[in-house]
Each structure stands twice: as structure tokens, then as C-alpha cells.
Amino acid sequence: MTMDALSRLVEALRCLPGVGPKSAQRMVFHLLQHQRQRGLHLASCLEQAMKHISHCQQCNNYTEQTLCALCQNPNRDSTLLCVVESPADVSAIEQSNSFQGKYFVLMGKISPLDGLGPDDIGLPKLKELITREKIQEVILALSPSVESQTTIHFIHQLLKDETVNISQLAHGIPSGGELEFLDGNTISSALKNRAVINV
């Protein structure tokens, strides 16, 4: 059975997190009934983003250039590196206005059940960056979970021969909580009260 344009759009919107069939249908009907021009603008912006946004060659954050704006910024503290799971976490920390160093985005956590090992999340690239840029402190800003603890352990082992301090965010971030959904004050407090890791 072939789908018509309306059904295809409803089905396409369901790929977004938290959007079920009813929500997707409401969005489509709203755009068709009240916001056709904005719907066309949305489609155009989405197409441009999908075509032109890729990953920064140094930190893996999203960018339209070879290096993202944060990596290019000479005013950032290049001796301080914050390691996060996703570009959404970079955005959350930046909104807290509590960190002036550089970032490295892992694009996930080590998870054998999902087939993700150290190489899949870019740990060799992380080590290379730390050595090349002479990083003095690595802050592990990972959401609390079993996979995060596994990832932290692997990073610590990877860097054991490097002359670099390794710390992680202080408690206050709820277990199982996602960094991108926390308010700026919580993130700021966790960064300021980060703890040195002893594995």
C-alpha cells in the first residue's frame, strides 16, 4: 500500500524523540492548516542543516566548517579539555557559562551490548588530541550510568602514562540523568566541584 504525502510526513516526524503518531499528526495538521509558509521554511532549514552540518575535525562537535567556532576561539583555555557524550552536552555546558576550555565529543559511551567499543567512540583520537595540544586537565562530563563508568575507566587507563590531571563532574547530577536536560546552575556547580578520579 502506497502512502500519500500526508501519511509520509506524519511517519517521517515520528523519527524525532518523544514524537508518537498522535503528536506527529497534530504537527502536520497544524502546519497544513495554519503555518504553510513556516512549514516550507522548516523544510528548507532542515534540508540545509542535513546537507551542510558535519563534525569538527578536532573535537567532533557539530559545525559547517572544518573546525567549530569553539576550537577556533583563541580565548578558550586550550590546556583544559571537557569530554562529553554528545554535541547537546556541549550546548548545555556552554549555556551554563561556567567553562572556558575546549571540548571533545565522544559521540556515545562504551557499551558492549550495543557493539560500541573504545575505537567506536573515538578514544584513540582523544588521546592523540591530549598529547598534541598538551592538555593539562581532562574533565569527564558524562551522564551517570554504568556505561559512563565503563567509559571513564577506559579513558583513565588510556591516559595513565600521560602527565594530565583527570577529573569528573561532582555529584548533584542525578543517576541516570542526561546532561543536556539539566539546568545551568546544576551544571555550573558540578563543574566547579569536580573531583579528581582515582581508579
UniProtKB/Swiss-Prot annotation:
| Keywords noted in UniProt | DNA damage, DNA recombination, DNA repair, Metal-binding, Zinc, Zinc-finger
Classify the source by domain of life: Bacteria
Question: Which species is the source of this protein?
Answer: Legionella pneumophila subsp. pneumophila (strain Philadelphia 1 / ATCC 33152 / DSM 7513)
**Could you identify this protein by its name?**
Recombination protein RecR
Q: Which segments does the record annotate as C4-type zinc fingers? A: 56-71
Annotated Toprim domain ranges read 79-174
List the Pfam families hit by this protein, alphabetically: RecR_C (PF21175), RecR_HhH (PF21176), RecR_ZnF (PF02132), Toprim_4 (PF13662)
| Functional summary from the UniProt entry | May play a role in DNA repair. It seems to be involved in an RecBC-independent recombinational process of DNA repair. It may act with RecF and RecO.
State the family it belongs to: Belongs to the RecR family.
- Entry's InterPro entries? DNA_Rcmb_RecR, Rcmb_RecR, Rcmb_RecR_Znf, TOPRIM_dom, TOPRIM_RecR
Asked if the record carries the keyword DNA damage, the reply is yes
GO-annotated biological processes: DNA recombination; DNA repair
Q: Name one GO molecular function term.
A: DNA binding
Q: Which cysteines are joined by disulfide bonds?
A: none
Which CDD domains does this entry report, sorted A to Z? Answer: TOPRIM_recR (cd01025)
